[in-house]
Design a protein with these regions (language model features):
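Phosphate-binding active sites in nucleotide-utilizing proteins
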Residues: 169-260
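Residue at a conserved register position within TPR or TPR-like alpha-solenoid repeats
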Residues: 15, 49, 82-83, 113, ...
Length: 260
């Protein structure tokens, strides 16, 4: 039975998350061939082309996405951040007109402001760029329901729940040993990863969700973030050796033949 366009598109999305961009494009092509040519398909195609370094095709795909859905903010944002000065004046006019008439929610509108910021910055209009960036940040902040007190309380619970590190288990001789790089954004974690990746014995895997998902499996609780109160309450009953084995089993395909 042929796959539906929805299934094909979902496969392409997952392949993109796995950095399998060439294969993702094949699924996107099949999606379009079966009648699934829409703004989302074009947008994901543009992202895949960007990651493969095929910038002309990425630009064409983002423009196609905008042609299919003129107010699709993510396509405008992605197009602007390709960093192409050619056509920037026309894109600025298009963005300003769209921002004047849009009724998009703040969560979407902020990407239009970000796009305008980037285009104006490329054109040397620093004052206009800053104003657009500020509006985008304000819109984004309005859309984020952040509770600092609740987050602090959650970290306090984590510290109280894990006063010591659970005992490690022995891996088999042929198992790769994971290296975790921990740090806040913009603190050099990516640079450190690239430095380590220069070793032939180390395979770069980027930012993975596997450990987080295995913790959810071990505590039999799903939540949007890594922890919530329910999963922390179950932390004492989790089998961490099993969690570790499952994690290694789920990521081993990423590093065939590597030691780290």
């Amino acid at each position: 039975t042929p796959m539906t366009t929805r299934v094909l598109f979902d496969f392409a999305q997952q392949l993109t998350l796995l950095d399998q961009h060439e294969l993702a494009v094949q699924f996107l092509d099949r999606t379009v061939a079966q009648g699934g040519d829409n703004h989302s398909t074009a947008y994901f195609r543009g992202n895949a082309m960007k990651f493969m370094g095929r910038m002309d095709e990425a630009e064409a795909a983002f423009e196609h996405s905008i042609a299919l859905k003129p107010d699709y903010s993510h396509a405008h944002w992605a197009l602007a951040f390709l960093g192409r000065k050619t056509g920037a004046e026309q894109r600025v006019e298009r963005l300003r007109a769209l921002l004047q008439r849009t009724t998009a929610a703040d969560a979407d509108r902020c990407y239009l402001d970000y796009a305008l910021y980037r285009e104006l910055e490329m054109l040397g209009d620093d004052e206009g760029a800053w104003q657009s960036l500020e509006r985008g940040f304000q819109a984004k902040r309005r859309s984020v329901q952040h509770d600092a007190a609740a987050e602090t309380a959650l970290f306090d619970q984590i510290i109280a729940r894990f006063p010591t590190v659970p005992r490690a288990f022995s891996t088999t001789d042929d198992a790769a040993t994971p290296i975790f790089i921990v740090g806040m954004p913009r603190t050099g974690t990516t640079l450190l990863e690239r430095i380590l990746g220069n070793s032939l014995s180390i395979t770069l895997c980027g930012e993975l969700n596997d450990l987080r998902m295995q913790y959810k499996w071990a505590t039999d609780n799903y939540c949007p973030g890594f922890f919530d109160e329910k999963s922390l309450a179950r932390a004492g009953d989790a089998d961490y050796a099993e969690l570790g084995r499952r994690y290694l089993d789920h990521v081993k395909w990423r590093a065939p033949g590597s030691r780290r």
